[in-house]
C-alpha cells in the first residue's frame, strides 16, 4: 500500500488517544506571579516526525517547574500546553505563585539560568526556541502543593518519544508516544498522550506503563479511538514475489517502506487475519 509510484508500504502503526485526569484543589492567594513560556519549537506530527527528536514544549516546561519546585517555595497556578494529542507541542505557558517579591526574584534568576541551559542543549536543531520569564504582583487561585507536584512529577517521569526501533529497517520507529496536551482548569489537571505501535504486544506494554503512571500519581485513565497496526514481517514470500515482479516489469528497484502512522491496512489485517497481508 502506498500513494507513491515505485514504493511499497509494508507496515503501519496502530494508536489511540490516552488521557490521564486528576482532580485538583485551589485556594486564593495574593503575592507574586512568575510567568513562564516556552515557544518557537519545531513541533510536528507525532507519527512521521517523532523520530526527529523535536523537543516537546510540555516536557521542557515540566523540567523547569520541577527544578523550581526543588529549589524554591513555588506553587503552581496554571499550565497550558498543546492542542492535539497527535501534534508535538511547540509552545507551553505556565504560572507559579510566590509569597513575596524576594522569593519571586530568586525564582526568576533560577529560571533564566535554566532557560540558558535549554538553549545550549537544543538551539543547534531548534533555532527559534525561546524561554520567556516575567513577574508581576497579583492574586490567583493557586493549586495545592500536593496536586501541583503530582501533576508535574508525572510529566517528568512519563515516557515520551521513540520507545522501540527495528534496526533491520534502518532504525524504523516501531513504538512511540507523544505527550500532546498538558493542561489545568479550575478543578482538574490533564495529560493526553498519543501512543503508537505497529506491534500489538508493544502497544499493550506501553498502555500498561501509562496506567502505572496514572495509578502512582492519582490520575484516572481514559482511552478512545484505538485502531490496530500492521506489523512488519521479517520473512514474507508475497513481498519477495512483488519485489521481483516489479523489477521485471519496470526494470527498477521497488522501494520498501514502513511508516509510523495509521493506514487502512491496519484494520484490514486485523479483521481479515487469513489474508496474506504480512507483506
Regions found by a protein language model. Give the residues of each.
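Short glycine/threonine-rich loop-to-helix capping motif typified by GTGT followed
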Residues: 85-93, 140-143, 231-243, 267-270
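Active-site-adjacent substrate-binding region
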Residues: 63-80, 224, 232-268
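Conserved small/polar residues in nucleotide/adenosyl-binding loops
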Residues: 271-277
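Generic hydrophobic alpha-helical scaffold/packing signal
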Residues: 108, 180, 194, 211, ...
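Generic recognition of stable, solvent-exposed alpha-helical segments in well-folded globular domains
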Residues: 56-60, 106, 205, 237, ...
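C-terminal structural cap/anchor segments
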Residues: 199-238
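A general structural signal for well-ordered alpha-helical packing
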Residues: 108, 148-152, 176, 203-214, ...
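Midchain, well-structured core segments that form catalytic/ion-binding scaffolds
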Residues: 1-196
